[in-house]
Swiss-Prot record:
It comes from Archaeoglobus fulgidus (strain ATCC 49558 / DSM 4304 / JCM 9628 / NBRC 100126 / VC-16). The keyword Manganese applies. This is Probable inosine/xanthosine triphosphatase. Its EC number is 3.6.1.73. It is an enzyme of class 3 (hydrolase).
Amino acid sequence: MGSKNPTKIEGARRAFEQYFDDVEIVGVEVSTSAPPQPFDAETVRGAIERAKKAYSPDFDFSVGIEAGLFRSECTITGYLDFQVAAVYDGERCTIGFGPGFEYPKLVVEEVLKGKEVGEVMEKVSGIKNLGKKVGAVHYLSKGAISRTDLSRISVTMALIPFINREMYL
């Protein structure tokens, strides 16, 4: 796993445990060319690079997860946040998205000035290291959805071609 973030690791574990036995997730720090606060295609590229850089022939799969803002019409701020997962088996890389949601206008305004979502949301929520705990989505959804949930869903979506190999030849 191309991250040591506990919410991402746990989400990936839950996704893989839906389909595989004896799942072990090893988190490793990797660097990517994506900026600290990615937008649009930078988010997808960051997830792919995390998965590929975390890969070792000792692993069956590696995973990269990256959250970022995507431009979108019909939103208050013009942006939605999506968590993107990439799963890599040494040959094939697949992508999955989690559910998208919108940050408050004041958060997006600060991000567009160069701050990271996590930094702004810590101030808004008063919760230190929010992104490594339950995530901003947990705070904004009043506890209904956690960052672990978003990670699980995005990794599950990325696993679809692997769990249906005969359909994705």
